[in-house]
Each structure stands twice: as structure tokens, then as C-alpha cells.
Amino acid sequence: MDSKKAILMLSLLAMALISSVMSARDLTETSTDAKKEVVEKTNEVNDAKYGGGYNHGGGYNGGGYNHGGGYNHGGGGYHNGGGGYNHGGGGYNGGGGHGGHGGGGYNGGGGHGGHGGGGYNGGGGHGGHGGAESVAVQTEEKTNEVNDAKYGGGSNYNDGRGGYNHGGGGYNHGGGGHGGHGGHGGHGGHGGHGAVQTEDNTQN
């Protein structure tokens, strides 16, 4: 009789132990799912604020094909790429960015902060040379490529504005100030935001 009671007690204890283990596992999975959901919701909010995906892409560490951006290492893409606070921008047309090492790309580099800009046409930078106005001017393009590599682009080519701390630049009214990138023809695009720069009238 005592052995039956002992077996019954052991069975009940085993069932209780199994039940508690399963409950703990369920709680852990629920907690993990809840954390994932919070992260996803946060990412959705940040995507809504800063962009994400192929068009207007970005997010915190984003990119995307068109109008990319984001906070850290953001941006890139083929058209109007770039932006982001650190290491932002690039892309084929209209780079940019705010913070260190911003901008770049083929048309209209730029950036705000140290080592901004570059690119083939309308690169950013202070005191370099803007992109060539015509593809036919081969020697000037080569000179500009060298100067882009040395200075990150430049100022005062068809009203292109010189940058401050390697920002802005370009030709045909491109860039300027802290941030804005050059742009190839027309008015330069819009790069990262920065402090207002006192314009140097000697460059105009």
C-alpha cells in the first residue's frame, strides 16, 4: 500500500515538474516573441520616420535604390542616394550625408563635416574644383578627378557654392554650406542638415 502511495506521489511530482518546465518554456517563447514584436514595431516607426525599402529606402542602417538614407552608414542607392548621420550617402546621382565621411557618388557629392564630398561632377569640398561642364573637356575632367581625390570637389563653378569643412560644392548652382551636395546641372540637391554657415562672399 505504501509503495502505491509512493508511486502515486512520484507520478504527481513528475507531472508537476513537466508542467512547470513547459510553462517556463512557454513564458520564455512569449517573452521572446514580445521582444521581437517591440523591435519590429520600433523598426516600423523608424522606417516611417527615416525610410526603408527600395523606394525612399533607408532605416537606421539602410540604403535602397531611390532616395536612400538612414542614421548610421545609411543611404546609397542609384538615384538621389545618401544622407544619414555617419558615413552617409553615395550613390550614382546626388550623394550627400551629414557627419564624418559624408557624400560621394558620380554626380554631386557633398556632405557635412570632415572629409565630405567627392564624386565626378559637382563634388563637395572647400577650395577644390567643380565638375566639368562638358564631357568634351577631357583634360579638365582629368584635373577635376585629381582635385576631387585631393580636396573632395570644390567651389565657384557656375555659381557652385564652396563648402565649409569639406561640404557642398558642385556646378550649375550646386550645393553650398554645411551639407548640400552639388548636383549635375540645374540646382544642386539637398544633403544633410547642419549649422548655418556664414557665406564667404569672396568666392562668389
From Swiss-Prot:
Region described as 11 X 3 AA repeats of H-G-G: 98-192
Compositionally biased region (Gly residues): 169-194
Induction description: By cold stress, abscisic acid (ABA) and water stress.
Sequence repeats: 54-59, 65-70, 71-76, 78-83, 85-90, 98-100, 101-103, 112-114, 115-117, 126-128, 129-131, 164-169, 171-176, 178-180, 181-183, 184-186, 187-189, 190-192
Domain of life per record: Eukaryota
Entry-linked Pfam families: GRP (PF07172)
Keywords of this entry: Repeat, Stress response
Region called Disordered, residue ranges: 169-204
Purpose: May be involved in resistance of the plant to environmental stress.
Protein family membership: Belongs to the GRP family.
Protein name listed in UniProt: Cold and drought-regulated protein CORA
